[in-house]
From Swiss-Prot:
Catalyzes the attachment of tyrosine to tRNA(Tyr) in a two-step reaction: tyrosine is first activated by ATP to form Tyr-AMP and then transferred to the acceptor end of tRNA(Tyr). Its EC number is 6.1.1.1. It comes from Natronomonas pharaonis (strain ATCC 35678 / DSM 2160 / CIP 103997 / JCM 8858 / NBRC 14720 / NCIMB 2260 / Gabara) (Halobacterium pharaonis). It is found in: Cytoplasm. Keywords: Aminoacyl-tRNA synthetase, ATP-binding, Cytoplasm, Ligase, Nucleotide-binding, Protein biosynthesis. Homodimer. The gene is tyrS. It catalyses: tRNA(Tyr) + L-tyrosine + ATP = L-tyrosyl-tRNA(Tyr) + AMP + diphosphate + H(+). The keyword Cytoplasm applies. This is Tyrosine--tRNA ligase. InterPro entries: aa-tRNA-synth_I_CS (IPR001412), aa-tRNA-synth_Ic (IPR002305), Rossmann-like_a/b/a_fold (IPR014729), Tyr-tRNA-ligase (IPR002307), Tyr-tRNA-ligase_3 (IPR023684), Tyr-tRNA-ligase_arc/euk-type (IPR023617), Tyr-tRNA_synthase (IPR050489). The keyword Kinase does not apply.
């Protein structure tokens, strides 16, 4: 692949890229630029994480050196979402789940490297750099940067503010040319682009994934079980959630069913050279087969494809994609119980 093709692969199925020309320059100057994504091991991973993880398959194919940070300290700093005693089990669970998602997306999990926050964030050089960032950042700037990521209140904990600066610093500490994350991470990585050059580091290029709508419409909520599909949900649960999902005929706005198809199912099926089939009785026009998401959306908007026909096909396809990850996680019930005792014990 040439530089343009590699950049196209990095940029596809994303919400925003800052800046495309910077990524092209990286490919022109380096054989294997570096990229990283960080996840704080808090709640169970779900299909929203899967769409973000699937993108790493594109990064690997484009020839990026990819690191996944399991940010264990961050998981406690953000309003103690993960108690200290659960950090080890949840970190192991996240690594296992991410490996499963990468494999299910058609890439080799050996193409990514894992690192935990405690592997480097307690070292003296990192700590000194963090103190320098703390000295240079106002309270309001830190709050603004992390407003979409950490819990906010009128009287925030210091942990939530340190969290934001640590995430910005992680880019430099991991020597990442590209910072990747959901679009909710934008504020933090703009802070990194703004401040890291003042401390002797290069500013990172940034790639942002879209945040999916919940199945009930609006933003996906980690606390609302029916708004998302967990990686351990079985086929029956997936069918039930998709069957009850917000998916009004002809409407694409805040339609989680369509978004799951666009950002997860079709990219995975494309990797497998598989088409998406909607089964319909002959009296309603017979089966429909789609090679691209755009074709499906056009039929949905025009009314050719009805939600009653789309939903069963979507549920079956999502189950097919999630199944190998589900099987991998359920093979180790002790890990699930250790990481999330309130659900699996």
């Amino acid at each position: 692949m040439d530089t343009v093709e590699r950049t196209d692969l990095v940029a596809r199925f994303t919400e925003e890229v800052i800046e495309r020309d910077e990524i092209e320059t990286l490919f022109e100057e380096q054989d294997e630029p570096t990229a990283y994504i960080g996840y704080a091991p808090t709640g169970e991973m779900h299909i929203g994480h899967f769409t973000t993880m699937r993108k790493l398959a594109d990064f690997i194919d484009a020839g990026l050196d990819v690191t996944v940070l399991v940010a264990d300290l961050h998981a406690h700093l953000d309003d103690a979402k993960s108690p200290f005693e659960l950090l080890e089990a949840r970190s192991e669970y996240y690594e296992r789940a991410i490996e499963g998602m990468i494999a299910a997306a058609g890439a080799d999990p050996d193409g990514i490297s894992f690192i935990r926050g405690t592997d480097f964030q307690l070292d003296e050089p990192y700590t000194l750099d963090l103190y320098r960032l703390l000295a240079d950042t106002t309270l309001s700037r830190a709050q603004r940067a992390g407003s979409e990521v950490v819990r906010q209140s009128e009287n925030p904990s210091l942990g939530s503010l340190v969290y934001t600066l640590m995430q910005a610093l992680d880019v430099a500490a991991l020597d990442a040319d590209i910072a990747y994350g959901g679009i909710d991470q934008r504020g933090i990585y703009m802070l990194a682009r703004e401040q890291l050059p003042d401390h002797g580091y290069d500013k990172p290029a940034c790639v942002f994934a879209p945040l999916l709508s919940g199945l009930s419409g609006g933003k996906m909520s980690a606390s609302e079980a029916g708004s998302k599909i967990n990686l351990t949900d079985d086929g029956e649960a997936i069918d039930e959630k998709i069957g009850g999902a917000y998916c009004p005929a002809g409407e694409t706005e805040e339609n989680g069913v369509l978004e799951y198809l666009e950002y997860l199912v079709f990219p995975v099926f494309d990797q497998r050279d598989t088409s998406f089939v909607v089964e319909r009785p002959e009296k309603y026009g017979g089966d429909l087969e789609y090679g691209t998401y755009d074709e499906l959306e056009a039929d949905f908007v025009s009314g050719e494809l009805h939600p009653a026909d789309l939903k069963p096909a979507a549920a079956a396809a999502i189950d097919e994609v999630v199944a190998p990850v589900r099987e991998l996680l359920l093979e180790d019930p002790e890990l699930l119980a250790s990481a999330y005792p309130e659900r699996y014990e």
